[in-house]
């Protein structure tokens, strides 16, 4: 069994380890407790939460904080700028609520959450990094960083302006890195010698559920490996990556990730070629790049289940068996008031989408497909 009790997540030369992302926890808290026990019992200890992850902080209080010694785990939490109306008052109020929700006296890692160009002026005018540094001086934060979803130029400005940031959390996966902008983010982090915590290594599950032709490529090569393990392995081996977060929602996913890290080996040239073949198949699939983070849900005045609508659209488009009518039936089981058809295109959901999706426009595609 591996033991990461003394793992230095701030040392970019260290081999990456597995982190427990809590965005998609099961509703059953007893199941979460079993997952936490298994995670810690296998020597892993980095657990990531956020104020906006539904009941995640409270669940960790029950499943982790009340049941395990404080020196057996690290917790990362986040400051969401878009939920603040004034600083420092709202920062203090939200931070104290996070401590109360988690039952912790301090956070091991704390991030300014989901930064992009739209938050730049707020971050600088309110000196959110400076406020976090003050909490660090008080011992309430041990290590400070930020998570990022913007363009390359702003990422470099952040890295230059804020040397007080000790690490960066980036979306990294073989789809976004090999065919998207994520390689540029990765190169910048390496340039500034920043340790990288990886989020969305499986891109919200979309790299665990590939189109049949793409899945066939990987299964013929390695029939006993899960599809998701390819995505996890790719990100874990990237330079400067010290932790790969996986938003696990059941014990099967937990055990699969543990197996992947236990058997971690560099990808061969043939395996790299296979991933490029998979990407060629994915290029034929015009899906919606939603990762089901649900950051948009709190902004919708009609409580439309945006993530579920996009997931069903992608499932139907991905299905080459001719059974997409099954997905359509499931979609129509959603109450009409929560379906894509109810969207009034107000755009309130758009600003907080980390993937920068034009949600109202994409909802139109959902309506058209399932009408």
Predicted stretch roles:
Residues 24-30, 41, 85-202, 209-216, ...:
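Glycine/proline-rich, positively charged
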Residues 41-48, 64-65, 184-371:
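Structured C-terminal cap/extension of enzyme domains
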